[in-house]
Amino acid sequence: MGRSRSRTPPRRERRRSRSSSRDRERRRRERERSRSRDRDRRRSRSRSPHRRRSRSPRRHRSSSLSPLRQKDRRDDDRKDVKEKPAKVHQISAEDMQGKTEEEIEMMKLMGFGSFETSKGKKKDGSIKAFAVNVSQKRKYRQYMNRKGGFNRPLDFIA
């Protein structure tokens, strides 16, 4: 790993005037100034999260409602509460026959005396809530032995 022993050409001494050194100094300063300007520009650009679409001033909407609106909303809430009467469980004498004291207490509290299943029975209020579980046959995509080879997009399956 030695260096080649070729001769270097003789260096030429050249007289430099002071004006060229001043020019060089001035160019260096300008370069530094432009670099710092670019750096500042880059920094300011990266700090701003996003630019608004329109340059016209925007009005900021406050998240809180105006006092008048809040009052209206409270009134509406009160009306809703008044409209819904508290459900009073009607217990007839027929329901009481053959029940223990605990079951009677439970009927007074909750409105039912025993825990029965309601599967398959129609109950009022349950008409609105329903779901159907439909199982469909599985559709498979053909990956191999297809026209166009592997690089072709797969067929759409809905």
From Swiss-Prot:
Positions of the UniProt region annotated as Disordered: 1-100
Organism: Danio rerio (Zebrafish)
GO terms for cellular component: nucleus
Pfam families documented for this protein: SNRNP27 (PF08648)
Biased composition (Basic residues): 1-30, 42-62
Annotated localization: Nucleus
UniProt-listed GO biological process terms: mRNA processing; RNA splicing
Family: Belongs to the SNUT3 family.
UniProt protein name: U4/U6.U5 small nuclear ribonucleoprotein 27 kDa protein
Predominant place of localization: nucleus
Family annotation (PANTHER family): U4/U6.U5 SMALL NUCLEAR RIBONUCLEOPROTEIN 27 KDA PROTEIN, U4_U6.U5 SMALL NUCLEAR RIBONUCLEOPROTEIN 27 KDA PROTEIN
Protein keywords: mRNA processing, mRNA splicing, Nucleus
Domain of life the protein comes from: Eukaryota
